[in-house]
Amino acid sequence: MKKTLLGSLILLAFAGNVQADINTETSGKVTFFGKVVENTCKVKTEHKNLSVVLNDVGKNSLSTKVNTAMPTPFTITLQNCDPTTANGTANKANKVGLYFYSWKNVDKENNFTLKNEQTTADYATNVNIQLMESNGTKAISVVGKETEDFMHTNNNGVALNQTHPNNAHISGSTQLTTGTNELPLHFIAQYYATNKATAGKVQSSVDFQIAYE
């Protein structure tokens, strides 16, 4: 019994020493922050899986990198967004929008547009799809696995910024008002040249979730 106890104490002491000897230059820690709000918006059923068809366009319209063509409007409608809650206003959002993301086809090198996923023999080359806010002038940077806007440096274990970054990737952000039954969020999709385009088919897709501010 004494030998067993002694062995256990030695093992615990050894384990403590191992933890104390972790090299701080080769290790670290990530702390995550977030918030759950009272709001209960839902995506309108018929808008959960949309198809948007852009008109055909001549390849000369996309002959140079960053050329865009055929801006095409589309709408995603939310429902049941009344911000009035029985639990007070402490955790009630003021605005709602959409968070567009894709882990497979975001093109970081071309302004976080969406790569052409068409795999048939007659697919267009050097053509992506770009999303825009409804004003037609502000591009939407779709979130991909290389997006870094959400990270902040910690200082001695304390996050320097525990709020959303200035660019929280919430698109179509709209003020929530009492009595709102349906809330349409408007966007634009357009062709985007990553170089001189060749003729062929274009297809891409993006996921989205409701996001609050």
Swiss-Prot record:
InterPro entries hit by this protein: Adhesion_dom_fimbrial, Adhesion_dom_fimbrial_sf, Adhesion_dom_sf, Bact_Fimbrial_Adh_Pro
Signal peptide: 1-20
Pfam family, one: Fimbrial
Subcellular location: Fimbrium
SUPFAM superfamilies noted in UniProt: Bacterial adhesins
Domain of life: Bacteria
Chain coiled-coil ranges: none
Keywords assigned: Disulfide bond, Fimbrium, Signal
Example GO biological process: cell adhesion involved in single-species biofilm formation
Function, as annotated: Mediates adherence to oropharyngeal epithelial cells. Helps the airway colonization process.
The family this protein is said to belong to: Belongs to the fimbrial protein family.
Name under which the protein is recorded: Major fimbrial subunit
